[in-house]
């Protein structure tokens, strides 16, 4: 029997818009804030108790050596902590959770901080010719966000081109994608108004400059930018003729971080910790890189099977909305009822900080299970290169006893 792994705390930053309210914060600033907030919820865990941190991060240029290590030390963890940074593109944060759980199961760690972060705003441009010297003519700047985050390296096509292929392959219209996006914004807006994100978001204080007061950021920045008329009239971005994917019906470029604290059963008993959820299983898969959009349709069933369940036993699903068509296509293939999917909206409305999102969807999934009466939840996220990662968690009841 596989030893259980428990989630005892979660936290995330609000998600900031590109060059928005969180733009002054670095990858490590964002990550450390989420980690501190998660640890503050479990005072029984002291900094010296944490064995390891596994943290996702995609756009690592100019971030500095060992980004996860920076997060750990900035969050106040000891210099003895083992730190690993994961780059599995959009699935990085979820892969970090899987690795943390595996290390606990293997007996090499008892308490692991996991999650991910991204400051897409602070990603630099590259000047490749500068290394050897530009001898003659113009030199071209390379956008780091596009090069390392949003471009299929094999076909040299943007991720949105793959989304257009997915829409064509599966027969999803522009109108269907717009409707999915509108519902994502509506669900996120309702969740915001009802305080559904309060237990997961740790407000961030941005220091005022030149005599200006500090600003407290406590909600996701994108949600309130929703304009249905503009969404429906937006031009297709990636395909001129008969294009269906637009800026508004796709995820956004964002900044943010999310963190979770995982513990073994032995450490749960020793410290008298109250678990929020148990990790029941996970699954990963890959296919042709240009079809990464539907890789979750392979990974999700594997995760559910690994957990010893069937898809109809899952109460709520979180699928990262890289594009509206990703949610639509994977839900159709896996026969997931849309009322079970992304109950509080998804990346279209909330934002998609690349290295953070895989962890963020698990944090939000747990919020949904707790507040909407669910027991079993499954999260899945596709990633550039053709892959996907998925995880199944089970909410622990308030009367839980070992």
Swiss-Prot record:
Q: Which GO terms describe its cellular component?
A: cytosol; mitochondrion
Q: What induces it?
A: Expression is up-regulated in azole resistant clinical isolates. Expression is induced by exposure to arole antifungals such as fluconazole, ketoconazole or itraconazole.
| Top-rank taxon | Eukaryota
- Keyword Lipid biosynthesis set for record: yes
Q: What is its main location?
A: cytoplasm
One example GO MF annotation: metal ion binding
Cite the entry's keywords alphabetically. Answer: Acyltransferase, Cytoplasm, Lipid biosynthesis, Lipid metabolism, Metal-binding, Potassium, Steroid biosynthesis, Transferase
Location relative to the cell? Cytoplasm, Cytosol
- Metabolic or biological pathway: Metabolic intermediate biosynthesis; (R)-mevalonate biosynthesis; (R)-mevalonate from acetyl-CoA: step 1/3
Q: Which residues bind K(+)?
A: 185, 250, 348
Q: Record-annotated residues binding CoA?
A: 185, 230, 251
Q: Where is the active site?
A: 90, 352, 382
Q: Which residues cross the membrane?
A: none
Name of the protein this chain belongs to: Acetyl-CoA acetyltransferase
UniProt lists the gene as ERG10
